[in-house]
Amino acid sequence: TQVSGDFKQVGSDAFQKLGGYIFGQNVTDEKIAMTAPVTQTQSPDGSYLVSFFMPSKHSLDTLPNPTDAAVTMVEMPETYFAVTRYRGGWSQEKYLDNEQRLTDAIDAMPEWEVAGEPIWARYDPPIMPSFFRTNEVLIPVRQTRP
């Protein structure tokens, strides 16, 4: 779902919509298991795309349609990612520090280039103490030469 707002707040705002879908606010009232990670990507217009991943037993054909028009479903194409994992809270500063480290690492490898917007992946619920939380920055990449 696409959400406008600040870095920290959009995850909570989007969870209301996405959580509603998996908790049964869909055309069949079906409850769907929560999976991880929850991802957040800033779009060029400044809004954020916040996403849940559906359990592997489902496909776009077997998932119930959402009742909230703000919830959309897409199948992700196969993509290569450069990834860095870190522990800690969900501050924008911590995310940006890790994003920069990963971007620098990609820039240092001439055989790879950035192929899309960075993605923030969160694996733990908000009730998890921040020092136990697992987070990742994923950056889509492609080879510059075969």
What does each of the following model-derived ranges do?
Residues 1-146:
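A solvent-exposed interaction/effector surface
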